[in-house]
């Protein structure tokens, strides 16, 4: 009874914890989504000439042209605009690009009106249809799509050559827009042999997991990620030389934040892949005029975001050059201004000699007279338009008068030298207005025109203000803000994105900006504006301290308060005067674990299953001639009672020690499969920068990892208890159905005078009709089906066998002892022991099948749509044959021999450790560990003089 209570208690705790995490994830601290939906008419046309003659995947995929029009696109297609090609993501569709085509056409029409007849810039939006393929689950599918993308780009560029129009430049490159895994396909494409050099120079990705695959259930996809990321790092390590094939490529990565429940937004970072000269990572919360979290699908149709992307496209294109885009520096400057959500400077410098500049004074809602003004270490907030560069800027900021602002390096008398124009931080105002904020730690120069002076627009000016908070997780801290513009509060101690916080406000605090420090090693722009709701705002951030995400190695720096403040991962910029109180939101923090550790809910329970199985075999081997195999219920209860606390200490210690380099060296040295280098956690990247990441266990170390590790292990143990009960319930119901349906059949009747006999011909036992089925399945694996399907069928077969054995035992137990199938108590115990063994294997195989389902889903989808997909699991008979033979062997009720128990211990022990330490990043190995175990148990059970019950053998 106590064992049942222990199991039940752990199961109830597990259910409660999972529900709490889910409620926290779904309901606590959600990003506010304020996306607008804009309807537009689109027309599509199949690019008919692009067939199997131009790509070996011409019959599998297709290419289309998308236009914002109510009229059909005439054939043959004659493109004439700037080429943009869209690559949809996992199970996506080619029509998703329609809203972008619509907003680009709308923006172009309005700019024509603004410029009074200028021809404007036309775009040709091409889109690839991958037939909703599951590219996130299968590496081979990812490679196929990348190869097809290169073929499509080459064909598109050739179309422009064939249809060249007088006065138009023939494009030699395209802009690629990728959603989700489409962004990864775009990065893979430039690494393949069929990539046409310089045919891609700008890539924009939306919610794309660049660093780590969202699911690691397929070995190929982890290998593709590893090779592609290594290629990009090695290329940029060459700098701007001709040895770098990617030197002219700029890439923008945009994430949706917490609202994206499909891809962890930590994985969008390009920090360790691309230098700042070529790449930018940001969040939709950070982007001016967007300022909202966006879910995984809405990122393609959110009106505010697609408007900003379309505006940026108009900024970076130049139809008069073959590349169709402006130089790399201009493109990156545009990306920073449009998407970083931060203040930036122009690259050009100018001097102001002998000008009459008036010192600025602190004050609110000032109306300045025409002329130059200057100040030092100032910040300003205004509704003026600051430093617009083009008609596109003017279109975006239709209200407000122009104000010119510079940051200067030096001042000598009335001269200001080495001045750069400031592009301000945009701040949301009331009634959908947009304000401009400028902060300068140095010399600020301001030029107020007569028009600006007479416009009635206002300026708030005050000194810059920054303070650091010595915060810890055990309490809260209260700050008073008195600055007339804003006050910056840094939190150097809050370094983990796994923890969420809550801020209570009072007084006149009307807006809080959360952002990362300007000098923080991370270059991912994660900021958001928070409006207090019932005097409260919720704080959470990505990137810093995220599991498995590479981070820059620390270099010796000053440790004074000012340096710590600027490098703090979390800053709060408080607009208004009042009090703010920050504290940890423990319930809200639980939801952060779900997105980061979904795969762990598969790998860690597998480790627990192998630990329990090790305990079962240890008891079985130590019990002598009267060997009894413990039931999974009993073994799990024993594990919880006697070993779980020790196991929690072990995993807590593992989480702590992996922060040491020599420990990680050793763990990578003993890893199966080998990573190729014991220094795999070190990432040598561009310009000598060195990044590192912890790719073991929880992907983090330190106090948070030490706390989370035991909690996750206890949760995994509870999952094993719950799954065990579910499998037992299923087999019990099936056995009841078998008993009722075959009650009168001779198979379940008890023959008299049956004795236990010995099988002297195990080879002959294999000459069984199920052997034909196994041979057929093996042939199909060699020729056509993936081994995951064969494994799933074997699992179903074992469940049926277990149910049959249970039904048979129940039927025999209902007879008197004199007519029992078993002549003595020892035989009954052996049968019960075997059923325990079969039930345990059923649970392990069911759990392993869950890991195989994603790859199996790719194959099933291909069959449904009539597409052939190459699988590495095709022809891989060794990955499932031991399991098939193991199931066949179980049908003869063979138990493992007691010889060589240490081999069983080693296999189970290392499988348990492997699933614990490497399971998150190598979940595909879960299948192979069971297959290895099945092969070994098959060998140990094939011994001469093995006891079986021949009359009960299942035909």
From Swiss-Prot:
Topology of the protein relative to the lipid bilayer: Multi-pass membrane protein
Source species: Yarrowia lipolytica (strain CLIB 122 / E 150)
Principal subcellular localization: endoplasmic reticulum
A Pfam family this chain is assigned to: PGAP1
Superkingdom of source: Eukaryota
Keyword list, A-Z: Endoplasmic reticulum, Glycoprotein, Hydrolase, Membrane, Protein transport, Transmembrane, Transmembrane helix, Transport
Lineage: Eukaryota, Fungi, Dikarya, Ascomycota, Saccharomycotina
EC number: 3.1.-.-
Protein location: Endoplasmic reticulum membrane
Glycan attachment positions: 7, 431, 753, 914, 945
InterPro entries to which the protein is assigned, alphabetical: AB_hydrolase_fold, PGAP1-ab_dom-like, PGAP1/BST1, PGAP1_TMD
Keyword presence, Glycoprotein: yes
Family: Belongs to the GPI inositol-deacylase family.
Active site residues of this protein: 180
Protein name: GPI inositol-deacylase B
């Amino acid at each position: 009874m106590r064992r049942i209570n222990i199991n039940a208690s752990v199961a109830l705790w597990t259910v409660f914890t999972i529900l709490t995490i889910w409620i926290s994830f779904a309901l606590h601290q959600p990003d506010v989504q304020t996306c607008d939906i804009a309807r537009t008419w689109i027309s599509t046309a199949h690019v008919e000439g692009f067939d199997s003659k131009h790509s070996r995947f011409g019959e599998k995929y297709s290419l289309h042209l998308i236009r914002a029009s109510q009229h059909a696109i005439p054939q043959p297609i004659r493109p004439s605009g700037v080429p943009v090609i869209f690559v949809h993501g996992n199970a996506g569709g080619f029509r998703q690009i329609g809203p972008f085509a619509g907003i680009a056409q709308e923006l172009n029409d309005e700019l024509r009106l603004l410029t009074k007849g200028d021809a404007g810039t036309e775009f040709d939006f091409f889109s690839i249809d991958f037939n909703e393929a599951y590219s996130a689950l299968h590496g081979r599918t990812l490679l196929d799509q990348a190869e097809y993308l290169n073929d499509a780009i080459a064909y598109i560029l050739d179309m422009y050559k064939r249809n060249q129009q007088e006065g138009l430049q023939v494009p030699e490159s395209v802009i690629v827009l990728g959603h989700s895994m489409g962004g990864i396909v775009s990065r893979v494409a430039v690494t393949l042999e069929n990539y046409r050099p310089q045919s891609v120079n700008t890539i924009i990705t939306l919610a794309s997991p660049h660093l780590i695959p969202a699911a690691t259930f397929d070995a190929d996809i982890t290998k593709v990620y590893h090779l592609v990321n290594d290629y990009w790092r090695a290329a940029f390590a060459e700098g701007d030389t001709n040895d770098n094939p990617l030197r002219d490529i700029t890439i923008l990565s945009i994430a949706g934040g917490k609202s994206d429940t499909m891809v962890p937004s930590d994985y969008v970072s390009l920090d360790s892949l691309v230098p700042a000269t070529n790449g930018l990572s940001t969040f939709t919360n950070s982007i001016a005029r967007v300022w909202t979290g966006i879910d995984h699908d809405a990122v393609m149709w959110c009106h505010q975001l697609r408007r900003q992307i379309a505006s940026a496209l108009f900024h970076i294109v130049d139809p008069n050059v073959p590349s169709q885009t402006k130089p790399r520096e201009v493109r990156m400057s545009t990306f920073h201004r449009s998407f970083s959500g931060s203040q930036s400077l122009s690259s050009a410098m100018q001097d102001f000699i002998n000008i009459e500049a008036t010192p600025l004074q602190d004050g609110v809602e000032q109306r300045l007279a025409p002329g130059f003004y200057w100040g030092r270490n100032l910040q300003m907030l205004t509704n003026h338009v600051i430093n617009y560069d083009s008609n596109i800027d003017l279109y975006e900021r239709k209200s407000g008068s122009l104000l010119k602002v510079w940051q200067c390096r030096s001042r000598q008398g009335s001269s200001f030298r080495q001045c750069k124009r400031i592009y301000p931080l945009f701040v949301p105002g009331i009634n959908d207005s947009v304000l401009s904020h400028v902060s300068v730690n140095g010399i600020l120069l301001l030029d107020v025109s007569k028009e600006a002076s007479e416009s009635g627009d206002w300026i708030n000016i005050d000194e810059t203000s920054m303070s650091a908070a010595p915060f810890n997780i055990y309490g809260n801290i209260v700050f008073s803000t008195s600055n007339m513009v804003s006050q910056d509060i840094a939190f150097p101690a809050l370094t983990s994105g796994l923890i969420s916080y809550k801020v209570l406000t009072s007084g006149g605090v009307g807006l809080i900006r959360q952002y990362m420090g300007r000098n923080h090693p991370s270059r991912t722009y994660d900021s958001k504006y928070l409006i207090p709701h019932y005097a409260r705002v919720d704080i959470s951030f990505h990137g810093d301290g995220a599991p498995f995400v590479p981070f820059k190695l620390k270099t010796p720096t000053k440790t004074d308060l000012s340096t710590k403040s600027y490098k703090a991962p979390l800053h709060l910029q408080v607009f208004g005067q009042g009090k703010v109180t920050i504290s940890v939101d423990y319930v809200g923090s639980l939801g952060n674990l779900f997105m980061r550790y979904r795969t762990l809910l598969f790998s860690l329970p597998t480790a627990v299953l192998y630990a329990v199985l090790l305990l079962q075999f240890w008891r079985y081997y130590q019990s002598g001639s009267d060997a009894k195999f413990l039931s999974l219920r009993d073994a799990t209860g024993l594990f919880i009672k006697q070993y779980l606390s020790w196991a929690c200490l072990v995993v807590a210690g593992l989480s702590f020690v992996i922060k040491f380099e020599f420990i990680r060296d050793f763990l990578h040295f003993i890893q199966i499969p080998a990573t190729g280098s014991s220094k795999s956690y070190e990432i040598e990247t561009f310009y000598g920068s060195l990044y590192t990441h912890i790719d073991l266990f929880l992907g983090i170390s330190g106090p948070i990892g030490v706390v989370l590790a035991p909690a996750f292990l206890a949760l995994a143990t509870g999952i094993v208890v719950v799954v065990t009960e579910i499998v037992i319930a299923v087999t019990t119901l099936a056995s009841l159905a078998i008993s009722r349906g075959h009650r009168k059949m001779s198979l379940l009747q008890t023959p008299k005078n049956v004795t236990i006999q010995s099988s002297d011909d195990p080879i002959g036992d294999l000459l069984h009709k199920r052997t034909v089925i196994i041979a057929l399945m093996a042939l199909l694996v060699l020729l056509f089906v993936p081994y995951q399907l064969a494994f799933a069928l074997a699992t179903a077969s074992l469940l049926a066998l277990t149910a049959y054995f249970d039904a048979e035992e129940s039927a025999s137990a209902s007879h008197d002892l004199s007519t029992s199938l078993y002549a003595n108590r020892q035989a009954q115990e052996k049968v019960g022991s075997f059923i325990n063994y079969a039930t345990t294997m059923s649970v392990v195989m069911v759990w392993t099948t869950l890991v195989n389902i994603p790859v199996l889903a790719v194959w099933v989808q291909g069959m449904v749509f009539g597409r052939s997909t190459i699988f590495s699991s095709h022809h891989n008979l060794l990955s499932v044959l031991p399991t098939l033979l193991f199931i066949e062997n179980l049908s003869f009720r063979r138990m493992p021999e007691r010889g060589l128990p240490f081999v069983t211990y080693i296999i189970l022990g290392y499988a348990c450790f492997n699933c614990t330490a490497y399971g998150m990043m190598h979940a595909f190995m879960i299948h192979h560990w069971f297959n290895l175990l099945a092969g070994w148990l098959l060998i140990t059970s094939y011994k001469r003089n093995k006891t079986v019950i021949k009359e009960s053998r299942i035909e």
